A protein has these predicted regions:
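Short, surface-exposed "cap/lid" segments of acyl-processing enzymes
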Residues: 3-44
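Catalytic histidine-centered segment of alpha/beta-hydrolase-like enzymes
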Residues: 287-301
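Short beta-strand/loop motif that positions the catalytic acidic residue
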Residues: 245, 251-253
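Alpha/beta-hydrolase-fold enzymes
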Residues: 69-72, 85-207
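Catalytic histidine neighborhood in serine/cysteine hydrolases
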Residues: 272-290
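Conserved acidic catalytic loop of the alpha/beta-hydrolase fold
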Residues: 43-46, 57-74, 86-87
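Gly/Ala-rich beta-loop-alpha elbow adjacent to hydrolase catalytic centers
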Residues: 78-86
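Conserved alpha/beta-hydrolase "acid-adjacent" motif
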Residues: 258-264
């Protein structure tokens, strides 16, 4: 049964959207799928300008409007980092009286980073904004199109990811070596595929990165009700999640998530007080870590079916397009860190364009 169309907002925290390959593959069985992919900041010429967290929020809204206008209303699914800007974008749409998505699914994200702080949260709390700027921001070297641009390099983010669980990575590589000795090519190939994605990293624009650190992990502007986003017209708008009334909410957390701690994503329910209780649901994935909520066996057998059931229950029967297959549409942008929006929906051509920019 066709269960609706969904925009998957991929994270901009060091990896490409291909990290969600398994997420998309599972969702395609029952849904028309759209996914964002953010450009590597080192490939964006300096003269194209900078990219800010506000730009991310504005692009999320533009994506939603584009899909609504061409295909009808949709569900929005955000994985890790984008839970915060996605909630902000939908909140702003609700405050203006715009049509909001049918549902929003928020998975393993730092809505309230104060809850059950992890090593990621502790670093942000213990270091000053100036420390991050002075120690983690570099200029793109001359051999790249974005030469001179200030970025948070992907290689630093990758080193941070590995440093969080060095024993686990060492054990994984030892198992890989033993699989090769035993001739277990299937297990070895699984290892190679995972690390091909895990080791592929991108650079992030410095302004976006530093603003995310301050807004999400230091000042907690979303949960404190003090976040003002500058819209494309240059006006500041206050983010008010309590204004959302027509969008159902599902939050998903992994029991052993060591990146977004227990309760951080669930906090969205307290902020979205305008959504009726029977339109809100929380799902904790027993035994799952951070990656287990969107890839692997638990994702395929538990999480994905739960999300699909939730979306089906909140579908708009007036918007019932054909069953999903595949098409890819590239959306050009007039701003520096534009994104490519990959559509995996029904086989049809479209002249529609939209814009966008910024991964787990």
């Amino acid at each position: 049964m066709y269960k609706g169309q969904v925009l998957i907002v991929a994270p901009l925290s060091g990896h490409y959207a291909t990290l969600l390959r398994e997420t998309v593959r599972a969702m395609l069985a029952d849904h028309r799928v759209f996914i964002t992919d953010w450009k590597n900041a080192r490939t964006v010429p300096l003269e194209d300008g900078s990219f800010h967290l506000d730009d991310y929020v504005n692009y999320v809204q533009e994506f939603i409007r584009h899909i609504q206008g061409v295909y009808g209303n949709c569900h929005v699914m955000s994985v890790c980092q984008p839970t915060v800007p996605v909630l902000a974008g939908i909140s702003l749409m609700a405050s203006r009286g715009e049509k909001t998505p049918l549902s929003m699914v928020m998975m393993g994200g730092p809505i309230d980073a104060r809850r059950s702080p992890t090593a990621v949260n502790n670093l942000a709390m213990q270091k000053s904004h100036a420390w991050f700027e002075n120690n983690l921001i570099y200029r793109v070297p001359p051999q790249f199109p974005g030469a001179g641009r200030r970025v948070y390099p992907g290689f630093l983010q990758h080193a941070g990811f590995v440093a969080m669980n060095p024993d686990r990575h060492a054990s994984s590589h030892w198992d890989y070596f033993e699989d090769l000795l035993k001739g277990d090519e299937d297990a070895a190939e699984t290892h190679r595929k995972f690390y091909d994605e895990y080791n592929a990293v991108l650079d992030m624009d410095a302004d976006y990165y530093l603003e995310t650190i301050r807004t999400v992990f230091q000042d907690y502007d979303l949960v404190n009700g003090t976040w003002d986003v500058r819209n494309p017209e240059g006006q500041l708008e206050r983010v008010r999640p309590q204004d959302i009334t027509q969008t159902a909410l599902l939050t998903v957390e992994g029991e052993h998530d060591d990146i977004s701690g227990k309760g951080q994503t669930r906090a969205a329910h307290g902020l979205c007080s305008g959504i009726p209780q029977d339109e809100r649901q929380h799902y904790e994935v027993r035994g799952a870590g951070h990656y287990g909520i969107f890839s692997g066996r638990r994702w395929r057998e538990k999480v994905c079916p739960e999300i699909s059931r939730f979306m089906l229950a909140h579908n708009d029967t007036a918007d019932t397009p054909e069953a999903p297959s595949t098409v890819v549409v590239t959306l050009p942008s007039d701003t520096p860190t534009q994104t490519v929006l990959d559509l995996a929906p029904a086989e049809q051509k479209t002249d529609a364009v939209a814009v966008a920019p910024v991964s787990v």
